[in-house]
Amino acid sequence: MKFFIDTADVNEIREANKLHFLDGVTTNPTLIAKVKKPFWDVVKSILAEVPDKPVSLEVASTDAEGMIKEGEKLAELGKNVVIKIPMTPEGLKAVSYFENKGIKTNVTLVFSPAQALLAMKVGASYISPFVGRLDDISHTGMDLIRQIKQIKDNYNFKSEIIVASVRNPVHVIESAMIGADIATIPYSVIAQLAKHPLTDIGLERFLKDWESVPEKPF
């Protein structure tokens, strides 16, 4: 399973990358707005931080022509740029255009198996179903991941499933158990993955006992 970080904060990307399990980055307009810096400065700094990993950068237009124009400009920034496109009929047109040119795409805001099927059918490199937002409206987001995984396996679609809108470590573990390709995770949740209260208690006890060891070698 691959781990992406869902952020536009270069400091968070840098810290996550130090853990040596980061495989990519996803961003969106909301995350970029939080940084409060010029758009091009933000995306260029992200790409410089992880030049060898895929970075999803989202278009802002709602029509295919505008998406293509914006996406081509983004793609010029580097070979690791993935064009993030909303799951709409116009978006699917843009996805087909980019994939036919060898430019990777990430179809975002996927909330149903039907949407995922269409995105996989047109050849999207990645699809991003949002589990947390489904949970917010009293649906079970992970059920969607199971359905999409089954469809993908039935037809051997090449699209990689990015579990998005991850809210907690349970989402990550359930994604791994289902067999999703990728989870894109906020930095706060990445930090939680390595923690367990019993680990902290055990380490504290070991350190305390270590102090009583005579003639310690180091």
Curated annotation (Swiss-Prot):
Pfam families membership: TAL_FSA
GO BP terms, alphabetized: carbohydrate metabolic process; pentose-phosphate shunt
InterPro entries the record matches: Aldolase_TIM, TAL/FSA, Transaldolase_3B, Transaldolase_3B/F6P_aldolase, Transaldolase_AS, TSA/FSA_arc/bac
Active site, UniProt feature: K84
SUPFAM superfamilies: Aldolase
Keyword set, alphabetical order: Cytoplasm, Pentose shunt, Schiff base, Transferase
Keyword presence, Zinc: no
Associated pathway: Carbohydrate degradation; pentose phosphate pathway; D-glyceraldehyde 3-phosphate and beta-D-fructose 6-phosphate from D-ribose 5-phosphate and D-xylulose 5-phosphate (non-oxidative stage): step 2/3
A GO CC term attached to the entry: cytoplasm
Keyword hit for Membrane: no
Annotated family: Belongs to the transaldolase family. Type 3B subfamily.
Function noted in UniProt: Transaldolase is important for the balance of metabolites in the pentose-phosphate pathway.
Annotated protein name in UniProt: Probable transaldolase
Native source species: Sulfurihydrogenibium sp. (strain YO3AOP1)
Organism lineage: Bacteria, Pseudomonadati, Aquificota, Aquificia, Aquificales
